[in-house]
Regions:
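C-lobe/activation-segment region of protein kinase-like
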Residues: 420-499
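Conserved structural core of kinase catalytic domains
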Residues: 320-386
């Protein structure tokens, strides 16, 4: 937990110029210190624990812009003479009673910190939501390990407190009418893979990752993904998000970034993050950025892919969102509409499985027409990515293949149909049926409510044999290994790491 690179996701997306002076309060073992050192001109850490300070210093011994001050915050704070562009409280604010000896420690904590901010500076605060849905669903309170302790208002414990959105808002107001932009890390702020905001809340069906309980035994009292959808439909998600990330300042100047999705549980050569941004005029756009220097080529290659695929797909009426190279990443057109996945789910929930099948197969046939123009032949590049699979000589393919044509990446609009993600496009033959296999597999298997469709034999109806299913499952495993390289994603260690 202390050393996972995923910890850095909580703030690595925040735009820095490289000239910032940053104060990190409660830096611990340096979970986010490295990210700050990469982005800022100067980083000062305050940490009470000698052992944790030494670990942090050793981890970041090559950073010449880092200073670690060891001691009690109230004492160290009195010696600070500088003003800071950012002051971070990542998993620290809940310990306010231990940091500040007063009648209103949490309010006073923010008041004291605010004195050290530059006029346009920001406090970056990450904390669990006392009313987070995971606690209702059977997760224990993070700090005390007991069920419902936070939900009931901490009746049997003291020293640590988390807050609801309403409670946190009241603290900000009392601390000097501080302004905050609210973000919602998912599954939580500790190991976030997606960050939502008030300007871009989750969409129905997006919150379906549940393997996130790494520290203690939990109960499973209900299906969280279904309850999330219900909360979203009733505009209640912000009150029940598992965690909050607040950008706090004396003035509310919104960051352009309103959504971040990390794809960095991969080989560094493929490690990226995707952002939705909104400029001052309200216009939205998408950015895809490398999270490592080694993944720049992978990201910038998207611009060329978009031009080549655009011509390729146009024959079947499929468009691609415009992509242009911008600085170290690419900028993509922001498109609005409903995904094919969402439309299929609506039909499923309405019990219209025949209409669902008809719609799904209209796209399966469309993709088949695009990708079966040539006879398949195996290349060294194919073997490198997918393994030496025993592909039938009668398989059809195309010279260029986007294997990620899953329903979630097909956007239905009034003006037409667009493919919104084509990151995994290869310029060598891949069996058309493998692309169709992935279309079906990632729709049926990514949400439990779709299990009822498995008896409809979608694979067989798509012309995929039992033998092919075995081959394509092995190809998919090999592709995942290729994408991950030597990296082992935390999710794959869940059964070994989590106590249940």
């Amino acid at each position: 937990y202390h050393f996972s690179h995923i910890r850095e996701n909580i703030l690595s997306w925040i735009p820095f110029t490289g000239e910032e002076n940053v104060l990190e309060i409660g830096s611990g073992c340096g979970a986010v210190t490295g990210a700050l050192c990469k982005k800022a001109k100067k980083v000062t850490c305050i940490e009470l624990s000698r052992k944790r300070s030494q670990i942090n210093a050793w981890r970041h011994r090559d950073c010449d812009n880092l200073k670690i001050l060891m001691g009690n915050f109230q004492e160290v704070e009195k010696t600070l003479t500088e003003k800071y562009d950012y002051i971070t409280l990542i998993g620290v604010f809940e310990y306010g009673e231990a940091y500040i000896q007063s009648e209103t420690p949490y309010v006073d904590f923010l008041k004291i910190i605010s004195r050290h901010l530059k006029p346009d500076g920001k406090i970056v605060l990450a904390i669990e939501n006392r009313l987070g849905l995971k606690y209702w669903a059977g997760c224990t309170e993070d700090h005390f390990g007991t069920l419902f302790e936070g939900l009931e208002g901490y009746p049997t414990t003291s020293g640590v407190k988390t807050f609801s959105r309403k409670e946190m808002s009241a603290i900000l107001k009392e601390a000097g009418d501080l302004k905050a932009s609210w973000y919602y890390p998912f599954p939580d702020y500790k190991l976030p893979m997606t960050i939502y905001s008030d300007r871009r809340l989750p969409l129905k069906g997006e919150l379906n990752r549940l393997e996130t309980n790494y520290d203690r035994l939990r109960l499973q009292l209900f299906q969280e993904s279904a309850v999330y959808d219900s909360l979203l439909a009733n505009d209640m998600y912000p009150d029940f998000a598992n965690s909050f990330l607040l950008l706090i300042g004396k003035e509310k100047k919104e960051a352009e970034t309103i959504y971040v999705k990390f794809s960095n549980e991969r080989d560094p050569a493929f490690s990226v993050r995707t952002e939705i941004c909104e400029n001052s005029s309200g216009r939205r756009y998408v950015r895809k950025l490398p999270t490592e220097k080694t993944s720049e080529e992978h990201v910038k290659n998207l611009e060329k892919i978009s031009r080549e695929l655009g011509t390729f797909y146009g024959r079947e009426g499929l468009e691609l969102n415009t992509c242009t190279v911008e600085n170290d990443g690419v900028r993509l057109e922001y498109l609005q509409g409903e995904t094919l996945e969402g439309r299929l789910d609506e039909l499923l929930e309405a019990g219209k499985t025949e209409e669902l099948e008809k719609l799904f197969f209209s796209y399966i046939k469309k993709i088949r027409r695009i990708h079966e123009g040539e006879m398949f032949f195996k290349t060294p590049e194919f073997v490198q990515v997918f393994g030496d699979a025993e592909i039938s000589e009668s398989c059809r393919c195309s010279g260029m293949s986007n294997i990620d044509l899953v329903p979630a990446n097909i956007l239905l609009q009034d003006s037409g149909v667009s493919v919104i993600d084509y990151e995994w496009t290869f310029r060598f033959p891949i069996p058309c049926n493998f692309i169709l296999y992935r279309m079906i597999h990632y729709y049926l298997e990514s949400d439990g409510k779709r299990a009822v469709l498995r008896d409809l034999d979608f694979y067989k109806k798509a012309g995929i044999s039992e033998k092919e299913l075995e081959i394509y499952a092995e190809m998919e495993r090999n592709f995942q290994k290729y994408m991950e390289g030597g990296h082992v994603p935390l999710r794959e260690m869940y059964d070994e790491v989590s106590p249940g």
